[in-house]
């Protein structure tokens, strides 16, 4: 089972946020919290709040045990960018880009979750390929 929490349009650059995301990927929840508490970055505070939120989601909504949870996936995608002008010499202007980030954190209680997901994708692809081969055979059979 996977528990998810999202936070959109957070005023931090995605590039800076991804540095913190890489620190906690595939770690246990307790270990991830310790890492974030001891990391002196703006992104660490934001991700720690979101991590606590997804832990609450997992325990209250999905009846998972907090001790068994681990960070399945952490994503920091680019959100909308605010564009501002900075006046320069001779009537020109430079663009200031105030970037924002969309965060997604997924927690799982099953260490083999990723293996099951990969196997499911492989079986879907096999079925799709087999279906295409059957269509090709039926089409080629009609033309003869």
From Swiss-Prot:
InterPro entries (UniProt xref): Ribosomal_uL22, Ribosomal_uL22_bac/chlpt-type, Ribosomal_uL22_bac/org-type, Ribosomal_uL22_sf
Domain of life: Bacteria
Gene Ontology terms: biological process: translation
A Gene Ontology term for the protein's cellular component: cytosolic large ribosomal subunit
Region named Disordered: 124-144
Flavoprotein keyword on record: no
Keyword Protein transport among UniProt keywords: no
Biased composition (Basic residues): 124-137
GO terms assigned for molecular function: rRNA binding; structural constituent of ribosome
Swiss-Prot/TrEMBL keywords: Ribonucleoprotein, Ribosomal protein, RNA-binding, rRNA-binding
PANTHER family in the record: CHLOROPLAST 50S RIBOSOMAL PROTEIN L22-RELATED (PTHR13501), LARGE RIBOSOMAL SUBUNIT PROTEIN UL22M (PTHR13501:SF8)
Alphabetical list of HAMAP family matching this protein: Ribosomal_uL22_B
Quaternary structure (record): Part of the 50S ribosomal subunit.
Family: Belongs to the universal ribosomal protein uL22 family.
Function: This protein binds specifically to 23S rRNA; its binding is stimulated by other ribosomal proteins, e.g. L4, L17, and L20. It is important during the early stages of 50S assembly. It makes multiple contacts with different domains of the 23S rRNA in the assembled 50S subunit and ribosome. The globular domain of the protein is located near the polypeptide exit tunnel on the outside of the subunit, while an extended beta-hairpin is found that lines the wall of the exit tunnel in the center of the 70S ribosome.
Entry protein name: Large ribosomal subunit protein uL22
Taxonomy of the source species: Bacteria, Bacillati, Mycoplasmatota, Mycoplasmoidales, Mycoplasmoidaceae
């Amino acid at each position: 089972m996977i528990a998810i929490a999202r936070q959109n349009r957070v005023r931090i650059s995605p590039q800076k946020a991804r540095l913190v995301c890489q620190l906690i990927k595939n770690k246990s929840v307790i270990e991830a919290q310790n890492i974030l508490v001891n990391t002196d970055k703006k992104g660490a505070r934001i991700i720690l709040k979101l991590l606590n939120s997804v832990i609450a989601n997992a325990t209250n909504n999905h009846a998972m045990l907090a001790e068994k949870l681990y960070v399945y996936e952490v994503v920091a995608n680019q959100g909308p960018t605010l564009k501002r002008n900075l006046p320069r010499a001779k009537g020109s202007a430079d663009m200031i880009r105030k970037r924002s980030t969309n965060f997604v954190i997924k927690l799982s209680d099953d260490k083999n979750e990723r293996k099951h997901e990969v196997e499911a994708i492989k079986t879907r692809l096999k079925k799709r390929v087999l279906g295409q081969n059957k269509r090709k055979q039926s089409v080629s059979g009609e033309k003869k």
